């Protein structure tokens, strides 16, 4: 373990501000109104307001990583007679398919491949051919490749066919402007340690209240019962059913203040976009190629092909960058040798410039 503070160029956990870290220096009692009403309830309200100005939505916080909340939604929103169409083009869509299988949830997996944008016409055809499908689930920002998926077009299909729409917006909510009511999203899932720039420890769901109220008695899990967690927070003014991750919650409350101070989601999106564009331009100038075409990229993380030089080893490249204070991500695409660089968190233009200089220095195979 080291005390050195690296710049994390990952899709989360990510580099957080000093003030977000300092917010965790306070110990809270989970029974206190100062915490439950003064912090948790304020967070719930702010999340709902970030998601939409429309009435009829609520939010619920859930201990654990983002995957816990995805599993909670799938396990609570779908009844025994329901069936979900899961749109998958990466590891996180595939994880939803795995969850559905383990829970015995009827599902149709539409896997369009890791580097392909989901075909909206193909989704339309699946819905038209199978009226037993009641729900659609998909990932917005698929960090396996850095692809941004067409949740607006699929949302229009969900609305037209009258399907419940579940969106994993883990690596996009708070960093990409969206109105979940306009997108016809019934359940949006995200996490504390992504674009809002908090630390790991809990995830959250912003849901259409009418849909969430109908989940009573459906959950396939005690601790991942989304309805029960929501009712506990509603009835007890922010109280969690089981131990609340108090320090993470305090950090998140501070992160929300810093999001507002930056200028909100639109301003943060602009910074992320500029980071990503500068990164791609600089990497191409160094001879690297992106896995995806530019029009498919999200402003969150970018996958680059590994150099073809036989001397290149990711582990050595990674080590040399880490020595200079930068941490990047290995590849996750099964069919391509690549690595990934994220640009969310407390990362600014000067950091991208410094990273590119460090990468040039770390390119030992060109020496």
Swiss-Prot record:
Enzyme Commission no: 2.6.1.37
Root EC class: transferase
Annotated keywords: Aminotransferase, Pyridoxal phosphate, Pyruvate, Transferase
One GO BP: organic phosphonate catabolic process
Cofactor: pyridoxal 5'-phosphate
SUPFAM superfamilies reported for this sequence: PLP-dependent transferases (SSF53383)
Molecular function GO labels: 2-aminoethylphosphonate-pyruvate transaminase activity
Name assigned to this protein: 2-aminoethylphosphonate--pyruvate transaminase
Gene that specifies this protein: phnW
């Amino acid at each position: 373990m080291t005390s050195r503070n690296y710049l994390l160029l990952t899709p989360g956990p990510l580099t957080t501000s000093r003030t977000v870290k300092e917010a965790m220096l306070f110990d809270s009692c989970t029974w206190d109104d100062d915490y439950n009403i003064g912090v948790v309830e304020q967070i719930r309200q702010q999340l709902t307001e970030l998601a939409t100005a429309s009435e009829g939505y609520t939010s619920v916080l859930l201990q654990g990583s983002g995957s816990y909340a995805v599993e909670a939604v799938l396990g609570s929103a779908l009844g025994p007679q329901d069936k979900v169409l899961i749109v998958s083009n990466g590891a996180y869509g595939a994880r939803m398919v795995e969850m559905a299988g383990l829970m015995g949830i009827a599902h149709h997996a539409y896997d369009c491949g890791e580097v392909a944008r989901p075909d909206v016409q193909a989704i339309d055809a699946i819905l038209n051919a199978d009226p037993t499908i009641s729900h659609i689930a998909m990932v917005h920002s698929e960090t396996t490749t850095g692809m941004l998926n067409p949740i607006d077009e699929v949302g229009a299909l969900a609305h037209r066919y009258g399907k419940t729409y579940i969106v994993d917006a883990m690596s996009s909510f708070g960093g990409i402007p969206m109105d979940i009511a306009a997108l016809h999203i019934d359940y949006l899932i995200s996490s504390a340690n992504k674009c809002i720039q908090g630390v790991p420890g809990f995830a959250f769901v912003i849901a259409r209240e009418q849909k969430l109220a109908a989940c009573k008695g459906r959950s396939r899990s005690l601790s991942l019962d989304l309805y029960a967690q929501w009712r506990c927070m509603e009835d007890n003014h922010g109280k969690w059913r089981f131990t609340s991750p108090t320090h993470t919650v305090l950090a998140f409350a501070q992160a929300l203040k810093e999001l507002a101070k930056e200028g909100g989601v639109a301003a943060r999106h602009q910074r992320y976009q500029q980071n990503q564009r500068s990164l791609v331009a600089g990497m191409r100038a160094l001879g690297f190629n992106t896995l995806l075409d530019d029009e498919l990229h999200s402003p969150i993380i970018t996958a680059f092909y590994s150099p073809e030089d036989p001397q290149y080893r990711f582990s050595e490249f990674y080590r040399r960058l880490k020595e200079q204070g930068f941490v990047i991500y290995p590849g996750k695409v099964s069919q391509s040798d690549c690595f990934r660089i994220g640009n969310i968190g407390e990362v600014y233009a000067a950091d991208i410039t410094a990273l590119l200089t460090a990468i040039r220095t770390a390119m030992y195979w060109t020496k």
